[in-house]
Amino acid sequence: MTSMFSLKGKTTLITGGSGGIGFSIAKAFAAAGSNVGLLYGRNKKALEYAAELRDKHGVQAKAYSCPIENRSAVIETTNQAVEELGGRLDVMIANAGIAIPHLSLEDKNEDIWTKVVGINLNGAYYTAQAAGHHFKKQGKGSLIFTASMSGHIANWPQQWASYHATKAAVKHLARALAVEWAPFARVNSVSPGYIDTDLTLYADENLRKKWKEYTPQARIGLPDELPGAYLYLASDASSYCTGSDIIVDGGYCSR
């Protein structure tokens, strides 16, 4: 049974690879035998992370700087990584994302909305396109989006209209592509709840206290509690699973 979860000899690319969730996924996938490409924006820690994966797990691992909101850059970087990591792409994880609190009525700065949409939604779509060409040529592949519980409900008390909207769109994009790409790829998503990463660092103690109060497990999740869902969706254990979304939120959406 455990062999169904093996990724030995496969290649995985992860956008947002220098973040808490992205690197946690990378560690789990490398431990399962996958070569790993980390696509990152500005955080050059991805270079150190790639070296760590190579040294600890003996897999191929490289880091690539890539502005995820730039379609041409995403496609070019994906093609480069595929060529350098073995010539095929088995798993693509569209994980890059940002959240910027803003007042939807009072905030007249359109730059916030445009930036969040550019990274969270456009970037996810460009990532899918880049991977889809390889999957179609190969006749097989697994695309996994990092959505959010914010795509299911509107978080409170923070005001994240742009984040909520983009993550709901990403979740439905996954379902749409699962239908369109059924002949050659599986497409699914994972919806994390409140996870202790750089994305939530802005929150003061009062806000974090509210998050815990609203979560049935009464705590904020850790990045290392997420990779199991991604590993399942990437592996042969989920060969008949497409168009699904796995919520990992400590029970938040079940209240």
Curated annotation (Swiss-Prot):
Keyword check for NADP: yes
Catalytic reaction annotation: D-sorbitol + NADP(+) = keto-L-sorbose + NADPH + H(+)
EC number in record: 1.1.1.289
Major enzyme class: oxidoreductase
Active site: S148 (proton donor), Y163 (proton donor), K167 (lowers pka of active site tyr)
Gene Ontology MF terms: oxidoreductase activity, acting on the CH-OH group of donors, NAD or NADP as acceptor; sorbose reductase activity
Keyword NADP: yes
A cellular-component GO term for this protein: mitochondrion
A Pfam family reported for this protein in Swiss-Prot or TrEMBL: adh_short_C2
Residues in the signal sequence: none
Positions of NADP(+) binding: I21, N95, Y163, K167, I195, T197
Keyword terms, alphabetized: Carbohydrate metabolism, NADP, Oxidoreductase
Family recorded in the similarity comment: Belongs to the short-chain dehydrogenases/reductases (SDR) family.
Functional description taken from the UniProt entry: Catalyzes the NADP dependent reduction of L-sorbose to D-glucitol.
PANTHER family named among the record's database cross-references: BENZIL REDUCTASE, L-XYLULOSE REDUCTASE-RELATED
Annotated protein name in UniProt: Sorbose reductase sou1
Name of the coding gene: sou1
